[in-house]
Structures are given as C-alpha cells and as structure tokens.
A protein has these predicted regions:
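Residue-level signature of beta-propeller blades and closely related beta-rich strand-turn architectures
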Residues: 15-17, 75, 100, 112-114, ...
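A short beta-strand motif characteristic of beta-propeller blades
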Residues: 34-46, 81-86, 136-145, 184-189
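Repeat-based blade/solenoid architectures
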Residues: 1, 42-55, 87-96, 143-158, ...
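Structural motif
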Residues: 18-24, 77-79, 116-128, 175-181
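Short, small-residue-biased leader/transition segments that mark boundaries at the very start
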Residues: 2-9
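Residues in Ca2+-coordinating acidic/glycine-rich loops
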Residues: 59-67, 101-104, 161-166, 182, ...
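Short, solvent-exposed loop/turn segments at conserved positions within beta-propeller repeat blades
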Residues: 16-20, 49-51, 87-89, 117-125, ...
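Calcium-coordinating acidic loop motifs
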Residues: 28, 60-62, 78, 99-100, ...
Length: 201
C-alpha cells in the first residue's frame, strides 16, 4: 500500500494575521487538491481573531495519535474543529517538543507581541512554556514589560544544563535562561542565539 503523504503550506497575505485568518486541509485526488475542511475565524467566536503567528507547527498536541495544527495562540484539531485558544495573542515563533521529562505529553515554548494587551483573556507573559494538550501556561517570564520592549520576537529552547533532566529556554527579553519545568531562573548568562538550535551527539 502506498504511504499517504501530507504537506503543510502557509501563505500570509498582507497583515491579515492580526484579524481574520484561515487554515485549510486539502486532499490530493488525482491531479487536484480537494478541500477536506476549512477553519475560518469568521465562523468562530471573536476570541480566535488575531491569535495566529508568523509560523505554524504540526504535532500530536493532544496525544490522540493524529497531528494537530498549532498556529500562535490557537490549536486546531485534526478534523478542523477547535482544540484550544489560549488568548495570548499574536507571536513570531513557536517550538514544540518534549521539554519536561516527567510531564505527560508535549510542551510549547512561544513568544508574543504586546502581551500586556492580552492579560484579560490570556496571562500577559511575553514568553511562555505551554501545555500542548490544552494551551494552559506551565511557566513564563516577561510580564509587565515597558511598551518599547513589548514585542518579544524571538525565543529558543534547548537542553543546555546537563544537571537538569528538562530543557531550558530564553528569549529576546534578555532576562535570563529559565527552566521549562517552572523552577525558575537557571542562569543570567546564556547563548546569544534566540531563533533556532540544532541538537546533535
């Protein structure tokens, strides 16, 4: 039996990420792409508006054996239905993986713009570690940032500390390197890179 192949394509038109956004699932039938489902924020409550990101990730967020789509502060189930919306607003970068050894499921590390504006529906932290299953915050830093520093455009997560079983993360807030498990500040010195990392042996 031929293996089914899946592909994700992202097209950002103008600056629509700050208002309405859509995600489509398409099947290749013969030589045609046929829509399977469409998630359009116009068909959902206003809390979904402006919750997407400059990138998305595909992973089994809820542990059901099927991949979901993570798009900023919003997660869409494999069938196109709502999984969760954390209410934390728009961000630039997302990382998904197993960052806390003894915690079930996957975790997300993400940074956000204008996080203070979303304290009412989110939690106001500019960089967060999030439970991928339900969008709840595990830990975070960068709350109550001054206006000129409120756009936290980058963060990174990596296993830097050999004495800890869990990963560490840091961001462009330049506040330090923190543990993903919520135990707090690990170090005030950390690598200068805040975009992507490569793990190797």
């Amino acid at each position: 039996r031929r293996r089914q192949r899946q592909m994700c394509i992202r097209d950002r038109i103008s600056r629509g990420i700050y208002k309405n956004w859509q995600v489509w699932a398409l099947d290749l039938k013969g030589n045609e792409l046929v829509p399977r489902w469409k998630f359009d924020t116009a068909d959902h409550s206003s809390k979904w508006l402006a919750m997407c990101s400059h990138c998305f990730r595909v992973a089994d967020l809820d542990g059901d054996g099927r991949d979901e789509i993570l798009y900023g502060s919003a997660a869409i189930d494999d069938n196109g239905s709502e999984l969760w919306c954390s209410g934390n607003g728009h961000g630039d970068i997302l990382h998904v993986g197993k960052f806390i050894k003894d915690r079930s499921g996957l975790q997300i590390v993400a940074s956000f713009e204008e996080s203070k504006d979303y304290e009412g529906q989110g939690n106001g932290y500019a960089c967060q570690v999030i439970d991928a299953r339900d969008g709840s915050m595990i830990t975070g830093h960068g709350r109550n940032l001054p206006v000129d520093a409120s756009d936290v455009g980058r963060c990174i997560v990596a296993d830097v500390d050999p004495d800890s079983p869990d990963f560490e993360y840091w961001s462009s807030t330049q506040e330090g390197m923190f543990s993903c498990n919520g135990t707090g500040l690990v170090s005030t010195t950390y690598p200068s890179g805040i975009a992507n990392g490569v793990m190797y042996n």
